Amino acid sequence: MSSTGSARTEGDSWDLASSVGATATMVAASRALASRGPDPLLDDRFAEPLVRAVGHPFFVRMLDGQIPLDTDDMPMTLQQRREQITVRTRFFDDFFRSATAAGIRQAVILAAGLDARAYRLSWPAGTVVFEVDQPEVISFKTDTLARLGAQPTAERRTVAVDLRDDWPTALRDTGFDSSARTAWIAEGLLPYLPPHAQDRLLDNITALSAPGSRLATENITDMRVFTDERARAMRSTWRQHGLDIDVAELVWLGERRPAGDHLEATGWSVTRLPTERVYADYGFELPDNEILREFRQAISYLSAELG
C-alpha cells in the first residue's frame, strides 16, 4: 500500500486481464459495444476481437450480452460507461484528425493498450504513429491484429517500454524526430501515475516537442472523485458478475498539479473543455448521475499547443 492510499506500488506490473490492464480491456469492450448496430457510435472493428483474445470472462460475457448494461444497482451503469468511452474516444480521434489536417505527420499514443487508431483512422500519407506501452501489451496487440490480417493505415512503430522507465530514449531509438511537430495523446492515463510521475511525463513530452506540437489528455483537479464511496460501490456489483476490480485502488491519490496548469507553466497554450460540453459536441447529454456529476467537476478535457 502506498502512502497516498492507493493499492499501487512503484514498479508494479500487470497484464490485460488484471489491475490497470483490465481497465484498458474494459475501455476496449465499451468501444466494441459502441461499434455495433446499423448506426454505430464508433467505428472500431478491432476492439471486439482484441477483447475476446484477452479472454477475461467478464468482458467476454459483456460482449455476449450476458451482463446488463443498464441496471439500477450500479452507481454508474455499463451503458453510461459505454457513452463516456464513446465521447472520450471520439474526442481523441478528432484531436488526431485536426492535428494531421494542420500538417502534423508524427503521432504518439502513450499507454496505447488496446488502442487501434494506427489501424482504424485514415491517416495522411507519410504519417508515423508511435505506440508506447509495456512489452507484453505491445506484443499481444501486434500478434492478435496480425492473426486477423489487419494492416496499419499509417507507418506504425511500437515502443515497448514502461512509461515509468526511460521511454524518451526508447522513443528516439525507434526513429522519433524531436525536430518535427508531434501530436501526443495520453488518454485515460494520468490517474494511474503518481503525481511526480505525471509531472515528469509532461516535462518529457515538452522536451521532446517541437514548437507547434499538440497534446490532448484529461485535466484532473480533484483525485478524490476516484475514492468516493459511490464509486467503490461498483466493485461489489461487478464482482457478482466476475470482475474483481476497484478503480479506487488502482489510481494514485494525493495532491497533484492539474496537467493544464503544469503545461501552461512550460510554454503550452491550453484549452480546457468541460465534460458536459464535450458530451454535447457529440450529441450526448451528461446523465444526471451522482458519480458523473462528481467527475464533471473534477475532470475536463484538455488540448494544448506548444509555442
UniProtKB/Swiss-Prot annotation:
Against InterPro entries, the record matches this protein to:
Ppm1/Ppm2/Tcmp, SAM-dependent_MTases_sf, SAM_mthyl_Trfase_ML2640-like
Cystine pairings recorded for this chain: none
User: What are the alphabetically sorted keywords of the record?
Assistant: Methyltransferase, S-adenosyl-L-methionine, Transferase
Q: Show the GO MF annotations.
A: methyltransferase activity
Name one matching Pfam family.
LCM
Residues noted as binding S-adenosyl-L-methionine in the record, renumbered to the chain: 133, 162-163
The biological processes this protein is annotated with in GO are: methylation
What's the Enzyme Commission number for this chain?
A: 2.1.1.-
Give the function comment from the record. Answer: Exhibits S-adenosyl-L-methionine-dependent methyltransferase activity.
Q: Which family does it belong to?
A: Belongs to the UPF0677 family.
Q: Which PANTHER family match?
A: S-ADENOSYL-L-METHIONINE-DEPENDENT METHYLTRANSFERASE YKTD-RELATED, S-ADENOSYL-L-METHIONINE-DEPENDENT METHYLTRANSFERASES SUPERFAMILY PROTEIN
Record protein name field: Putative S-adenosyl-L-methionine-dependent methyltransferase MAV_2732
Q: What species does this protein belong to? A: Mycobacterium avium (strain 104)
